[in-house]
Amino acid sequence: TMKHVGLNVAADPFMNSSLVGINGGLVLIVADDPSMHSSQGEQDSRFFADFAMIPCFEPTTQQEAYEMMFEAFEVSEKNHVPVMIRIVTRLAHSRAVVHPFEHDRFVKENTLSKADRMEWMLLPALARKNYEKMLQKQDILTEWSNNARWNPLTINEKRRDLAIVTSGLGRNYYLENLQDYKDLCEKQFQEQGLPSTLHIGTMPYPIDSLKKLAKTAKTILVIEEGMPFLEKMLKGILPQENIIIGKLSGHLPRTGELNPDFVRKALSLEVNPSVLSSSSISDTAANLPSRPPQLCKGCPHADSYSSLNKAVSLLKESAGSDNVAVMADIGCYALGAVPPYNAVETIVCMGASIGMARGAAQAGIKYSFGVIGDSTFIHSGITNLIDAVSTKTPMTVVILDNSIVAMTGCQQTILPSSQLETLVAGLGVEKEHIKVLTTNPSKIDENTRILVEEAEYRGVSVIILVRECLEAFRIRNKAAKAAKV
């Protein structure tokens, strides 16, 4: 499981996994984030599934997500391909009662036979053959999609002006407006009724159903969550005489999440006066006192940024503002970019801080800092630090070690904090320029002094600022108390 930007990091093995002979089911659940609630982009993972030429499921409800998981494994095992299940923020953050399958649906664990070694060697000569096999599977996968129950088609021969295609949560928002839309259609089109509809829950797309739908109407409205991926695809699949409308045509917004109000407008429905529209809610919220995100009270990062800001101020006094750069990374500590700290200048992606600090130093900035969390450093910072060491770049890496993966649920880091110093030394940083410091209010001035000293060093220095996350402390305490009971 991962979110969309996590798939970016996994792109190399992901793309190549479609070319090897998957021996047993392999299913990836990827969560996209329309409206960027906790991400730096709205990218749509369906592009990746299409790029890799693998099947993709897009559930509409929690029940569908549950049931699709079973079929995803079946499709993967039968066709020896990885399968993606693409969800979005709104579905990932929701709950509902799910009716499980009967126990006999579960297959007992079987021992897999060893895979053919030739299926797992992507040397050019073998990779070409595997690529041909993948292309041959496309017709089989398309036929499966044509018959999949996740793609219900409803044809109304009487209504010829419009047809509707939905996918994912777009179907929910259409159904939410269905009764009002039905009333409107009866009023405007009398006995012609509702337009023909096709809901798409799988990729490759069900070509047969799409072509049947295209014959019923000239104009097709596409309601999808995320980028206009399906809308673009239909323009290449369907005849040119079909007019495809949706996000690209301006009938639905290109940015942010879909909601029932946006779909309502696309269906030419008036906003229900008895229900607050999304825009009205936004206007109301704009007049409320703001509560911007901030570090938790007692967060160790607060003291770390206090030390860093003091050090940066001293360095700017001696070298000028343009000779100091502070690059940060993705994590709780990204909140160091906002008041009251305003401590960092860049936040791009996981691991970028060290690489950007190295670039700044090589571009001539005298004092360059890369601020990164302990878990992010292990995830994406190690190779950048190796690069900096190999080029003897004058820069300072500040690792904020709170002993936990705090931002995404307080998971344990894959390497204990006690081993960070050993790891950094093993990457080639000189031991006298690796400083492990406790960060708390009483240590701010001392830590400031050490930050300034290490910034003056004309090579790579690493400062590890250590204090346990308060939430991690609470979890550990709670577990300890429970163990005693």
Can you say where each PLM-predicted feature lies in the sequence?
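Short beta-alpha connecting loops at secondary-structure transitions
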Residues: 32-35, 52-57, 247-252, 292, ...
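Acidic, Ser/Thr-rich peripheral helices and adjacent loops at domain boundaries
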Residues: 103-112, 345-348, 352, 412-425, ...
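Short acidic loop-to-helix transition motifs that present clustered carboxylates
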Residues: 64, 199-207, 228, 332-333, ...
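Flexible, low-complexity linker and terminal segments
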Residues: 59-295, 300-301, 449-458, 462-485
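Active-site lining segments that contact anionic ligands and/or coordinate catalytic metals
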Residues: 80-82, 159-162, 218, 321-323, ...
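Thiamine diphosphate
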Residues: 1-77, 317-406
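A glycine-rich helix N-cap at a beta->alpha junction
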Residues: 21-31, 108-118, 390-401, 420-433
